[in-house]
Curated annotation (Swiss-Prot):
Its EC number is 2.1.1.192. It is found in: Cytoplasm. This is Dual-specificity RNA methyltransferase RlmN. Belongs to the radical SAM superfamily. RlmN family. [4Fe-4S] cluster binds at residues 144, 148, 151. It holds the Pfam family Radical_SAM. S-adenosyl-L-methionine binds at residues 208-209, 240, 262-264, 339. Residues 130-379 form the Radical SAM core domain. It comes from Rhizobium meliloti (strain 1021) (Ensifer meliloti). The lineage of its organism: Bacteria, Pseudomonadati, Pseudomonadota, Alphaproteobacteria, Hyphomicrobiales. Keywords: 4Fe-4S, Cytoplasm, Disulfide bond, Iron, Iron-sulfur, Metal-binding, Methyltransferase, rRNA processing, S-adenosyl-L-methionine, Transferase, tRNA processing. The gene is rlmN.
Length: 411
């Protein structure tokens, strides 16, 4: 088989035998802060003098060792393990499908159990291996309310917010599948960084608007960055928003991770059409929130995402206005060649025009990387994620190029 055929082939891995997702009446300990775990243990009769120690044990097993079965907690007494099994769960979501691109990009379709009177829901999580690092793209909602006109996810109505458990479980499951916990083996065929952690960066850039699910996203990211557990540096966590201005201020004050803005236009009239939330929070308000974001410097910049749409927002005049708009903000501008999907009215800018746009911005003093094509054979690209119930047939999706999220977060 020719090398090009191998690189353009998507390997679909059937769902492995995994522990079934939890029943809704059994609360999960995943996604709970220490104080919340302590309260639950006390309610179940754990003596007050033992609660703090038990919480520390559980935290270590959940987030350092990555176990998904209470019986694996070898330094926890048998009676305690039986109580935990009876009342709680730490199971992972079901893997419906795992797809592996020829370039090593992995996409998981995950199913979470019903919540209340709801139905099971499915979301997608994507892993992008690169030399020296690996980035996990995490979803925050099932569907999206923002209806950005160029985004495939935006054509799927919002079903519900993901819980902190469901957000964090995407990271835990990915680390499981990549052998990224102690004493876990890397799966055969996985393309991962040669040394150190397999997942070094996470980006909240999957399905949904993270800041419309602020509290759950906040809890999940605080746990992910906790130094006694998963221990991801906040400089390696990037939250992307379309511009929910009040929560941008809260993100800086309460979470403190890196910020990315889905900008895509430099004029309010055009951004109103491309990113309708702009009608509520126009560019002036958005830029004020960005300038006020805590800790900005040349080493800690805001990433501005700009999808390149042919004859829509890709002129040199647009580039000039972009430089003017961002004046005074430590920034990096990620240029995203548009990822086509069935039914879209947009086209990707010509490559020559993208390079001219990038050169102008670069000469003005801004880093302006063009996203590297990744996962093009598995529809894993920015703006293309959708749950399986909304998915096109494989023969259709293989007709469309996709470009995987890359170059996000700080090294």
């Amino acid at each position: 088989m020719a090398a090009t055929e191998i690189l353009n082939r998507a390997d679909i891995v059937k769902a492995p035998q995994v522990r079934l997702a939890p029943q809704p009446e059994k609360p999960s300990l995943i996604g709970l802060l220490r104080d919340d775990i302590a309260k639950l243990l006390a309610e179940k009769g754990v003596p007050e003098r033992q609660v703090k120690m038990r919480v520390s044990q559980l935290w270590h097993w959940l987030y350092v060792r990555g176990v998904s079965d209470f019986d694996e907690m070898s330094n926890v007494s048998k009676d305690m393990r039986e109580m935990l099994k009876e009342h709680f769960t730490i199971a992972r979501p079901d893997i419906v499908e795992e797809q592996v691109s020829g370039d090593g990009t992995r996409k998981w379709l995950l199913r979470f159990p019903p919540r209340g009177a709801g139905r099971p829901v499915e979301i997608e999580t994507v892993y992008i291996p690169e030399e020296g690092r690996g980035t996990l793209c995490i979803s925050s909602q099932v569907g999206c309310t923002l209806t950005c006109s160029f985004c495939h996810t935006g054509t799927q109505k919002l079903v519900r917010n993901l819980t902190a458990e469901e957000i964090l479980s995407q990271l835990l499951l990915a680390r499981d599948r990549l052998g990224d916990f102690p004493e876990r083996d890397t799966p055969q065929g996985a393309i991962v960084p040669a040394e150190g952690r397999k997942i070094t960066n996470i980006v909240m850039m999957g399905m949904g608007e993270p800041l419309y699910n602020f509290e759950n996203v906040k809890t999940a990211l605080l746990i992910a960055s906790d130094g006694d557990g998963l221990s991801l540096s906040k400089r390696r966590i990037t939250l992307s928003t379309s511009g929910i201005v009040p929560e941008i201020y809260r993100t800086g004050e309460e979470i403190g991770v890196m910020l990315a803005i889905s900008l895509h236009a430099v004029r309010d009239d055009l951004r109103d059409m491309l990113v309708p939330i702009n009608k509520k929070y126009p560019l002036k308000q958005l830029m004020e929130a960005c300038r006020a974001y805590p800790g900005l410097s040349n080493a800690r910049r805001i990433t501005f995402e700009y999808v390149m749409l042919k004859d829509v927002n890709d002129s040199l005049e647009d580039a000039k206005e972009l430089v003017k708009l961002l004046k005074g903000i430590p920034a990096k501008i990620n240029l995203i060649p548009f990822n086509p999907w069935p039914g879209t009215n947009y086209q990707c800018s010509d490559w020559e025009q993208i390079e001219k746009f990038a050169d102008f911005i670069n000469q003005a003093g801004y880093a302006s990387p063009i996203r590297t094509p990744r996962g093009r054979d598995i529809l894993a690209a920015c703006g293309q994620l959708k749950s399986e119930s909304e998915r096109m047939r494989k023969v259709d999706r293989l007709a469309f190029e996709a470009m995987m999220i890359a170059n996000h977060g700080e090294d």
